[in-house]
Amino acid sequence: MTFGTLAVISVIAVLGPLLALPKRWHQPVVLGELIAGILLGPTGIDRLPAGDVTLTFLAQIGFALVMFVAGSHVPVRDPRLRESLRIGAVRAIAVGIVAAALGVVIANIFGTGHAALYALLMASSSAALILPIVESLRLGGLPVLQLLPQVAIADTACIVALPLVIDPQHAARSALGALAVLASAAVLFVGLRHLERTGARKRAHDVSEERKFALELRTSLAVLFGMAALAVSTHISIMLAGFSFGLAVALVGEPRRLARQLFALTEGFLGPLFFVWLGASLDLRVLGSHPSFIVLGVALGLGAIAAHVAMRLIGQPMSIGALAAAQLGVPVAAATIGTQLHVLRAGEPAALMLGAIVTIVVAAVGGALAARAGLVSAPAIAQPKRPTTSGDVL
């Protein structure tokens, strides 16, 4: 690990958004970063040492921050989420049932034995991808409102369940670790809400702002790293630690100042570093020697789309179903954890990412079709902003 490596990654962090620059494509910035990592890794010129201990550790910090941001973006406080909760929950469960059947079929065809993992991937939805598309296209109407809880439920459930299904031999240990992390997140939520209601947060914020202490950022990083340490000690991925902490913050209310600080830290450096490292960790040359995994990746992507589009049978427009199929966080986490635990076959992590790319492309098309179909409204869907007098939570 050298400053030259960091300089290259920082340049990629600048160039990564170029792929997402055309607004009509609605492609996430991370695609450019992943592609850059792939080109710098063993698939391309092999100049980025993804196995470097220091780089890997920095990437894990970025992973925790990326999952925290994803959790904080779940619109759990949006009143429209509660209004459409029932139909959204029904559709999320129905997608899971269809995905379970498809997972068994795909696992049997390819002989991998990962039916549960494939089902989880195909049932997942990425709030971090879907909500920006909804906002940029100004999508609205009842079908879009019903999409919110469906995505929130699927995103949360799949991320919580992933550590259990990716390593079933240690499912009991993983379950206990997951419970410990989730219990810690629940305690954090209670504590954050208490600080908010008693005004302690406001007083600390005022002192921090006046004295330039950056208490919000320091406190949040301390909590995040503490939860990551708990996750590692209980043999659980830091993915769950970051995501559950993000949900706890979202339940209290997305803090504007903290959101800006963590956005700068995550999107400016550690997030791109993680995605570049992930791309460099994927040896896509294996797909050339195992072409069946190319078919597996396409099958997973198309299976996810089919499972979500099938909700047309219970009233969801096909374009919205295609949009709901967008995946990112769960496949990225599965590829990362599977590689670290050595539970996936050579080329399988790349196949998971290929499937995610297929869903992203189709989701962008689905969003555009929904806009053309007139599913548009003036207000964008976003996390409700807190009153300006309430400041930022710790």
What are these regions, as identified by a protein language model?
Residues 7-10, 186-219, 254-259, 372-394:
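Intrinsically disordered, low-complexity non-transmembrane regions of multi-pass membrane transporters
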Residues 22-25, 29, 39-87, 206-296:
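Membrane-interface junctions of multi-pass transporters
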Residues 3, 45-47, 100-106, 157-169, ...:
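Hydrophobic alpha-helical transmembrane segments in multi-pass integral membrane proteins
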Residues 80-140, 288-349, 353-374:
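Transmembrane alpha-helices that form the ion-translocation and gating core
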Residues 1-11, 51-68, 111-127, 176-188, ...:
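Structural signature of hydrophobic alpha-helical transmembrane segments
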Residues 12-13, 17, 37-38, 42, ...:
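Alpha-helical transmembrane segments of multi-pass membrane proteins
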Residues 3-10, 52-62, 146-155, 161-164, ...:
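Structural signal for the N-terminal portions of transmembrane helices
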